């Protein structure tokens, strides 16, 4: 994935609104939200989203009932190639009771979590990389 300044600007402007709900005006873009206090540790956000892997069944492309896994599937969605994130300190986040938190918003393009589709194909890493790419850390890259 590559960093995208437009997605960053969209995420930043939405984070500054301090709303704990998806941006309904984000168009055809994926989105993950994360809130944390007293400081924002990006590693915790990524660990939290990736931690949902245990609730996801790739074979059936479903989450364990009652659990969330959409953050994880968006992070690993193979056709998503752009990401941009923004963060803001909010005294109050609309939709959350805890006060004085940092809100992280990440937007993705193209979006993942498409109904009836899997986030990636099972198989050896990099086996399906396009011809003009290389395998770096078990991921297709330029």
Which residues make up each language-model segment?
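Mature extracellular or exoplasmic CAP/SCP-family domains and secreted bioactive peptides
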Residues: 1-142
